[in-house]
Protein backbone atom coordinates (compact mmCIF):
# COMPACT_ATOMS: atom_id res chain seq x y z
CA UNK A 1 0.00 0.00 0.00
CA UNK A 2 1.50 3.30 -1.00
CA UNK A 3 -1.05 5.65 0.51
CA UNK A 4 -4.62 6.42 1.36
CA UNK A 5 -7.17 7.64 -1.07
CA UNK A 6 -8.52 10.89 -2.51
CA UNK A 7 -11.80 12.45 -1.49
CA UNK A 8 -14.93 10.66 -2.57
CA UNK A 9 -18.27 12.12 -3.52
CA UNK A 10 -19.74 12.82 -0.09
CA UNK A 11 -22.97 10.84 -0.15
CA UNK A 12 -23.97 7.71 1.71
CA UNK A 13 -24.49 4.27 0.30
CA UNK A 14 -28.01 2.89 0.67
CA UNK A 15 -28.17 1.13 4.03
CA UNK A 16 -28.03 -2.65 4.10
CA UNK A 17 -28.25 -5.18 6.91
CA UNK A 18 -25.92 -7.68 5.31
CA UNK A 19 -22.83 -8.21 3.23
CA UNK A 20 -22.78 -11.28 1.05
CA UNK A 21 -20.38 -14.18 1.40
CA UNK A 22 -17.55 -14.69 -1.06
CA UNK A 23 -16.09 -18.13 -1.61
CA UNK A 24 -14.20 -17.48 -4.83
CA UNK A 25 -12.16 -20.02 -6.73
CA UNK A 26 -8.58 -19.01 -7.38
CA UNK A 27 -8.05 -17.67 -10.87
CA UNK A 28 -5.26 -17.18 -13.36
CA UNK A 29 -3.79 -13.82 -14.19
CA UNK A 30 -6.05 -13.11 -17.14
CA UNK A 31 -9.19 -12.91 -15.06
CA UNK A 32 -11.34 -14.53 -17.74
CA UNK A 33 -12.73 -17.54 -15.92
CA UNK A 34 -15.89 -17.53 -13.84
CA UNK A 35 -15.66 -17.53 -10.06
CA UNK A 36 -18.54 -18.80 -7.97
CA UNK A 37 -19.51 -18.20 -4.37
CA UNK A 38 -22.40 -18.72 -2.04
CA UNK A 39 -24.82 -15.87 -1.47
CA UNK A 40 -26.39 -15.49 1.97
CA UNK A 41 -26.98 -12.87 4.65
CA UNK A 42 -24.00 -12.51 6.97
CA UNK A 43 -23.44 -10.74 10.25
CA UNK A 44 -20.31 -8.85 11.16
CA UNK A 45 -19.20 -11.78 13.31
CA UNK A 46 -19.65 -14.25 10.45
CA UNK A 47 -17.67 -12.05 8.07
CA UNK A 48 -14.74 -11.82 10.47
CA UNK A 49 -14.89 -15.52 11.35
CA UNK A 50 -14.97 -16.74 7.75
CA UNK A 51 -12.41 -14.35 6.29
CA UNK A 52 -9.14 -16.07 5.36
CA UNK A 53 -7.21 -13.49 7.35
CA UNK A 54 -5.10 -13.18 10.49
CA UNK A 55 -6.71 -11.42 13.43
CA UNK A 56 -3.93 -9.17 14.73
CA UNK A 57 -3.96 -7.67 18.20
CA UNK A 58 -3.46 -3.93 18.56
CA UNK A 59 -0.25 -4.52 20.51
CA UNK A 60 1.12 -6.63 17.64
CA UNK A 61 0.49 -3.85 15.14
CA UNK A 62 1.95 -1.25 17.48
CA UNK A 63 5.10 -3.35 17.67
CA UNK A 64 5.18 -3.93 13.90
CA UNK A 65 4.91 -0.19 13.16
CA UNK A 66 7.10 1.04 16.04
CA UNK A 67 4.03 2.31 17.90
CA UNK A 68 2.63 4.04 14.81
CA UNK A 69 5.50 6.49 14.76
CA UNK A 70 5.01 9.54 12.52
CA UNK A 71 8.02 8.60 10.42
CA UNK A 72 6.29 5.28 9.64
CA UNK A 73 3.42 7.04 7.85
CA UNK A 74 3.42 6.29 4.12
CA UNK A 75 -0.01 7.65 3.26
CA UNK A 76 -2.91 9.66 4.57
CA UNK A 77 -6.50 10.12 3.44
CA UNK A 78 -10.17 10.12 4.30
CA UNK A 79 -10.02 6.64 5.85
CA UNK A 80 -7.10 7.48 8.11
CA UNK A 81 -3.35 6.93 7.95
CA UNK A 82 -1.29 4.12 6.44
CA UNK A 83 1.83 3.00 8.33
CA UNK A 84 4.77 0.92 7.20
CA UNK A 85 5.64 -2.09 9.34
CA UNK A 86 7.35 -5.49 9.41
CA UNK A 87 6.17 -8.99 10.32
CA UNK A 88 7.75 -12.43 10.23
CA UNK A 89 6.99 -14.19 6.95
CA UNK A 90 6.09 -17.51 8.59
CA UNK A 91 4.46 -16.66 11.92
CA UNK A 92 3.18 -13.19 10.93
CA UNK A 93 4.41 -11.99 14.33
CA UNK A 94 5.94 -8.49 14.56
CA UNK A 95 9.58 -8.31 13.55
CA UNK A 96 12.35 -5.74 13.68
CA UNK A 97 12.47 -3.04 10.98
CA UNK A 98 14.24 -4.34 7.91
CA UNK A 99 13.55 -8.00 8.71
CA UNK A 100 10.74 -10.28 7.60
CA UNK A 101 8.19 -8.91 5.15
CA UNK A 102 7.04 -5.33 4.78
CA UNK A 103 3.38 -4.56 5.47
CA UNK A 104 1.08 -1.56 5.20
CA UNK A 105 -1.23 -0.98 8.17
CA UNK A 106 -4.27 1.20 7.49
CA UNK A 107 -5.81 2.65 10.65
CA UNK A 108 -9.44 3.77 10.55
CA UNK A 109 -10.33 7.19 11.90
CA UNK A 110 -12.32 6.56 15.07
CA UNK A 111 -15.49 8.30 13.97
CA UNK A 112 -18.38 7.62 11.63
CA UNK A 113 -20.44 4.53 10.87
CA UNK A 114 -19.68 4.72 7.15
CA UNK A 115 -15.98 4.19 7.84
CA UNK A 116 -16.77 1.03 9.78
CA UNK A 117 -18.95 -0.24 6.92
CA UNK A 118 -16.13 0.30 4.45
CA UNK A 119 -13.67 -1.43 6.79
CA UNK A 120 -16.02 -4.41 7.03
CA UNK A 121 -16.64 -4.48 3.26
CA UNK A 122 -12.88 -4.54 2.67
CA UNK A 123 -12.59 -7.63 4.88
CA UNK A 124 -15.63 -9.27 3.29
CA UNK A 125 -14.28 -8.99 -0.25
CA UNK A 126 -10.49 -9.17 0.10
CA UNK A 127 -10.84 -11.83 2.78
CA UNK A 128 -12.16 -14.18 0.09
CA UNK A 129 -10.99 -12.78 -3.25
CA UNK A 130 -7.61 -13.88 -4.56
CA UNK A 131 -6.06 -12.71 -7.83
CA UNK A 132 -2.62 -11.47 -8.96
CA UNK A 133 -4.10 -8.06 -9.80
CA UNK A 134 -5.83 -7.50 -6.46
CA UNK A 135 -3.83 -6.23 -3.50
CA UNK A 136 -3.43 -8.90 -0.83
CA UNK A 137 -5.13 -8.29 2.52
CA UNK A 138 -3.18 -10.17 5.20
CA UNK A 139 -5.26 -9.45 8.27
CA UNK A 140 -7.21 -7.03 10.41
CA UNK A 141 -7.53 -5.76 13.97
CA UNK A 142 -10.72 -5.01 15.89
CA UNK A 143 -10.24 -3.94 19.50
CA UNK A 144 -12.80 -1.65 21.12
CA UNK A 145 -12.91 1.45 18.91
CA UNK A 146 -9.73 0.51 17.00
CA UNK A 147 -10.15 -0.84 13.45
CA UNK A 148 -7.14 -1.59 11.28
CA UNK A 149 -6.32 -3.46 8.06
CA UNK A 150 -3.00 -5.11 7.20
CA UNK A 151 -1.91 -5.40 3.55
CA UNK A 152 1.08 -6.46 1.54
CA UNK A 153 3.28 -3.41 1.03
CA UNK A 154 3.18 -2.05 -2.51
CA UNK A 155 6.68 -0.71 -3.04
CA UNK A 156 5.99 1.66 -5.92
CA UNK A 157 2.95 3.35 -4.43
CA UNK A 158 0.00 4.40 -6.56
CA UNK A 159 -0.41 4.96 -10.26
CA UNK A 160 -1.69 8.44 -9.39
CA UNK A 161 1.63 9.42 -7.85
CA UNK A 162 3.66 8.22 -10.82
CA UNK A 163 1.41 9.89 -13.37
CA UNK A 164 0.88 13.26 -11.77
CA UNK A 165 3.63 13.99 -9.28
CA UNK A 166 6.87 15.56 -10.40
CA UNK A 167 10.28 15.07 -8.85
CA UNK A 168 13.32 12.83 -8.92
CA UNK A 169 11.52 9.96 -7.13
CA UNK A 170 8.72 9.79 -9.71
CA UNK A 171 10.14 9.34 -13.17
CA UNK A 172 7.74 9.51 -16.16
CA UNK A 173 6.19 6.12 -16.87
CA UNK A 174 7.14 4.72 -20.26
CA UNK A 175 4.56 3.87 -22.92
CA UNK A 176 5.07 0.12 -22.54
CA UNK A 177 4.80 0.34 -18.76
CA UNK A 178 1.53 2.26 -19.04
CA UNK A 179 0.06 -0.32 -21.41
CA UNK A 180 1.12 -3.13 -19.07
CA UNK A 181 -0.42 -1.36 -16.07
CA UNK A 182 -3.69 -0.86 -17.93
CA UNK A 183 -3.74 -4.55 -18.82
CA UNK A 184 -3.13 -5.61 -15.22
CA UNK A 185 -5.87 -3.36 -13.89
CA UNK A 186 -8.24 -4.62 -16.61
CA UNK A 187 -7.57 -8.22 -15.59
CA UNK A 188 -8.38 -7.37 -11.99
CA UNK A 189 -11.70 -5.79 -12.96
CA UNK A 190 -12.53 -8.66 -15.32
CA UNK A 191 -12.00 -11.11 -12.46
CA UNK A 192 -14.49 -9.22 -10.31
CA UNK A 193 -17.04 -8.96 -13.10
CA UNK A 194 -16.79 -12.67 -13.93
CA UNK A 195 -17.82 -13.69 -10.42
CA UNK A 196 -21.31 -15.12 -9.98
CA UNK A 197 -22.92 -12.86 -8.90
CA UNK A 198 -20.75 -10.07 -10.19
CA UNK A 199 -18.71 -7.82 -7.94
CA UNK A 200 -18.87 -4.13 -8.84
CA UNK A 201 -15.74 -2.31 -7.72
CA UNK A 202 -17.34 1.16 -7.83
CA UNK A 203 -14.23 3.24 -7.12
CA UNK A 204 -11.81 2.51 -9.97
CA UNK A 205 -9.31 5.36 -10.19
CA UNK A 206 -5.58 5.99 -10.47
CA UNK A 207 -5.06 6.36 -6.71
CA UNK A 208 -6.60 2.92 -6.09
CA UNK A 209 -4.24 1.19 -8.54
CA UNK A 210 -1.14 0.24 -6.57
CA UNK A 211 2.18 -0.94 -8.00
CA UNK A 212 4.59 -3.58 -6.75
CA UNK A 213 8.35 -3.47 -7.23
CA UNK A 214 7.97 -4.62 -10.84
CA UNK A 215 5.23 -2.08 -11.60
CA UNK A 216 2.53 -4.74 -11.68
CA UNK A 217 -0.86 -3.10 -11.12
CA UNK A 218 -3.15 -4.26 -8.31
CA UNK A 219 -6.58 -2.95 -7.32
CA UNK A 220 -6.90 -1.76 -3.73
CA UNK A 221 -9.56 -0.27 -1.44
CA UNK A 222 -12.73 -2.37 -1.66
CA UNK A 223 -14.64 -0.25 0.82
CA UNK A 224 -17.21 0.79 -1.80
CA UNK A 225 -17.43 -2.55 -3.64
CA UNK A 226 -20.75 -4.34 -3.70
CA UNK A 227 -22.50 -7.29 -5.30
CA UNK A 228 -23.92 -6.86 -8.78
CA UNK A 229 -27.53 -7.44 -9.84
CA UNK A 230 -29.23 -10.79 -9.38
CA UNK A 231 -31.46 -12.68 -11.79
CA UNK A 232 -32.85 -10.61 -14.65
CA UNK A 233 -31.99 -7.29 -13.06
CA UNK A 234 -29.63 -5.11 -15.07
CA UNK A 235 -28.42 -2.97 -12.18
CA UNK A 236 -28.51 -2.38 -8.46
CA UNK A 237 -29.77 0.89 -7.01
CA UNK A 238 -27.64 2.78 -4.49
CA UNK A 239 -27.02 6.26 -3.28
CA UNK A 240 -24.15 7.68 -5.26
CA UNK A 241 -20.60 7.16 -3.99
CA UNK A 242 -17.33 7.31 -5.82
CA UNK A 243 -14.87 9.95 -7.00
CA UNK A 244 -15.62 13.01 -9.09
CA UNK A 245 -14.47 12.63 -12.68
CA UNK A 246 -14.49 8.82 -12.64
CA UNK A 247 -18.15 7.99 -11.95
CA UNK A 248 -20.37 7.02 -14.90
CA UNK A 249 -23.00 9.62 -15.88
CA UNK A 250 -25.98 7.25 -15.58
CA UNK A 251 -24.86 6.29 -12.07
CA UNK A 252 -24.55 9.93 -11.05
CA UNK A 253 -27.99 10.72 -12.49
CA UNK A 254 -29.98 7.72 -11.25
CA UNK A 255 -27.95 5.72 -8.72
CA UNK A 256 -28.23 2.71 -11.06
CA UNK A 257 -24.99 0.74 -10.68
CA UNK A 258 -23.74 -2.01 -13.00
CA UNK A 259 -20.43 -3.47 -14.14
CA UNK A 260 -20.59 -1.00 -17.03
CA UNK A 261 -20.12 1.73 -14.41
CA UNK A 262 -16.67 0.24 -13.74
CA UNK A 263 -16.01 0.13 -17.49
CA UNK A 264 -16.62 3.87 -17.73
CA UNK A 265 -14.15 4.49 -14.90
CA UNK A 266 -11.60 2.27 -16.66
CA UNK A 267 -11.96 4.45 -19.76
CA UNK A 268 -11.22 7.55 -17.70
CA UNK A 269 -8.02 5.97 -16.36
CA UNK A 270 -7.01 5.02 -19.91
CA UNK A 271 -7.32 8.69 -20.84
CA UNK A 272 -5.17 9.62 -17.86
CA UNK A 273 -2.52 7.15 -19.01
CA UNK A 274 -2.60 8.54 -22.55
CA UNK A 275 -2.58 12.20 -21.59
CA UNK A 276 -0.80 12.41 -18.26
CA UNK A 277 -3.70 14.61 -17.11
CA UNK A 278 -6.01 14.17 -14.13
CA UNK A 279 -9.68 13.30 -14.63
CA UNK A 280 -10.56 16.64 -13.04
CA UNK A 281 -7.94 19.39 -13.05
CA UNK A 282 -8.94 22.98 -12.35
CA UNK A 283 -5.37 24.07 -13.17
CA UNK A 284 -5.94 23.32 -16.85
CA UNK A 285 -7.23 26.07 -19.18
CA UNK A 286 -10.93 26.90 -19.23
CA UNK A 287 -12.78 24.18 -21.16
CA UNK A 288 -10.17 21.55 -20.29
CA UNK A 289 -10.96 20.96 -16.60
CA UNK A 290 -12.87 17.71 -17.28
CA UNK A 291 -10.62 15.25 -19.09
CA UNK A 292 -13.43 13.19 -20.65
CA UNK A 293 -15.28 16.21 -22.04
CA UNK A 294 -12.11 17.78 -23.37
CA UNK A 295 -10.51 14.67 -24.89
CA UNK A 296 -13.57 13.02 -26.45
CA UNK A 297 -13.50 14.94 -29.79
CA UNK A 298 -9.82 14.14 -30.35
CA UNK A 299 -9.84 10.38 -29.85
CA UNK A 300 -10.49 9.17 -33.41
CA UNK A 301 -8.30 11.55 -35.38
CA UNK A 302 -4.63 10.81 -35.78
CA UNK A 303 -3.57 14.44 -36.00
CA UNK A 304 -5.87 15.60 -33.20
CA UNK A 305 -4.86 12.71 -30.93
CA UNK A 306 -1.39 14.24 -30.64
CA UNK A 307 -2.96 17.08 -28.69
CA UNK A 308 -4.17 14.58 -26.08
CA UNK A 309 -1.00 12.50 -25.83
CA UNK A 310 1.37 13.04 -22.90
CA UNK A 311 4.38 14.94 -24.34
CA UNK A 312 6.65 12.90 -22.05
CA UNK A 313 5.85 9.87 -24.24
CA UNK A 314 7.14 11.43 -27.44
CA UNK A 315 9.00 8.91 -29.60
CA UNK A 316 7.93 5.85 -27.55
CA UNK A 317 4.81 4.75 -29.45
CA UNK A 318 3.28 4.50 -32.90
CA UNK A 319 0.21 6.61 -33.53
CA UNK A 320 -1.66 3.53 -34.73
CA UNK A 321 -1.20 1.77 -31.38
CA UNK A 322 -2.04 4.94 -29.50
CA UNK A 323 -5.16 5.34 -31.61
CA UNK A 324 -6.28 1.81 -30.73
CA UNK A 325 -6.14 2.63 -27.03
CA UNK A 326 -7.80 6.01 -27.61
CA UNK A 327 -10.68 4.36 -29.47
CA UNK A 328 -10.97 1.74 -26.72
CA UNK A 329 -11.18 4.55 -24.16
CA UNK A 330 -13.85 6.24 -26.28
CA UNK A 331 -15.92 3.04 -26.28
CA UNK A 332 -15.54 2.76 -22.49
CA UNK A 333 -16.77 6.31 -21.85
CA UNK A 334 -19.80 5.97 -24.11
CA UNK A 335 -22.85 7.81 -22.77
CA UNK A 336 -24.87 4.67 -23.54
CA UNK A 337 -23.82 2.15 -20.88
CA UNK A 338 -25.06 -0.82 -22.92
CA UNK A 339 -22.71 0.00 -25.80
CA UNK A 340 -19.61 -0.06 -23.61
CA UNK A 341 -17.42 -3.17 -23.99
CA UNK A 342 -17.17 -5.81 -21.29
CA UNK A 343 -14.00 -6.10 -19.26
CA UNK A 344 -13.31 -9.45 -20.96
CA UNK A 345 -13.36 -7.68 -24.32
CA UNK A 346 -11.13 -4.95 -22.96
CA UNK A 347 -8.63 -7.49 -21.62
CA UNK A 348 -8.49 -9.18 -25.03
CA UNK A 349 -7.81 -5.87 -26.77
CA UNK A 350 -5.18 -4.84 -24.22
CA UNK A 351 -3.43 -8.22 -24.48
CA UNK A 352 -3.17 -7.78 -28.23
CA UNK A 353 -1.69 -4.32 -27.76
CA UNK A 354 0.72 -5.52 -25.09
CA UNK A 355 2.30 -8.19 -27.27
CA UNK A 356 1.90 -6.41 -30.58
CA UNK A 357 5.05 -5.41 -32.40
CA UNK A 358 5.29 -2.66 -34.95
CA UNK A 359 3.77 -3.97 -38.17
CA UNK A 360 5.44 -3.16 -41.44
CA UNK A 361 2.04 -2.70 -43.06
CA UNK A 362 1.48 0.38 -40.92
CA UNK A 363 4.45 2.05 -42.51
CA UNK A 364 3.28 1.07 -45.98
CA UNK A 365 -0.35 2.12 -45.69
CA UNK A 366 -1.25 3.70 -42.37
CA UNK A 367 -4.70 4.82 -43.57
CA UNK A 368 -5.79 1.16 -44.00
CA UNK A 369 -4.67 0.40 -40.44
CA UNK A 370 -6.50 3.40 -39.01
CA UNK A 371 -9.66 2.69 -41.01
CA UNK A 372 -9.76 -0.83 -39.55
CA UNK A 373 -9.54 0.58 -36.02
CA UNK A 374 -12.31 3.12 -36.60
CA UNK A 375 -14.66 0.64 -38.28
CA UNK A 376 -14.48 -1.77 -35.33
CA UNK A 377 -15.61 0.84 -32.80
CA UNK A 378 -19.33 1.59 -32.33
CA UNK A 379 -18.43 5.03 -30.99
CA UNK A 380 -15.66 6.06 -33.37
CA UNK A 381 -17.75 5.61 -36.53
CA UNK A 382 -19.78 8.64 -35.46
CA UNK A 383 -16.73 10.90 -35.38
CA UNK A 384 -14.81 12.52 -38.29
CA UNK A 385 -12.42 10.24 -40.13
CA UNK A 386 -8.75 10.79 -39.29
CA UNK A 387 -6.37 12.27 -41.79
CA UNK A 388 -2.77 11.25 -42.37
CA UNK A 389 -0.01 13.53 -41.18
Swiss-Prot record:
Lipid attachment locations (N-myristoyl glycine): 2
Organ and tissue specificity: Roots, leaves and stems.
An individual GO BP term: defense response
Subcellular location: Cell membrane
Protein name (record): Probable serine/threonine-protein kinase PBL11
Any GO molecular function: ATP binding
Main location: membrane
Keywords noted in UniProt: ATP-binding, Cell membrane, Kinase, Lipoprotein, Membrane, Myristate, Nucleotide-binding, Palmitate, Phosphoprotein, Plant defense, Serine/threonine-protein kinase, Transferase
Task of the protein: May play a role in the regulation of plant growth and development. May be involved in plant defense signaling.
InterPro entries, alphabetized: Kinase-like_dom_sf, Plant_Ser_Thr_Prot_Kinase, Prot_kinase_dom, Protein_kinase_ATP_BS, Ser-Thr/Tyr_kinase_cat_dom, Ser/Thr_kinase_AS
Gene source species: Arabidopsis thaliana (Mouse-ear cress)
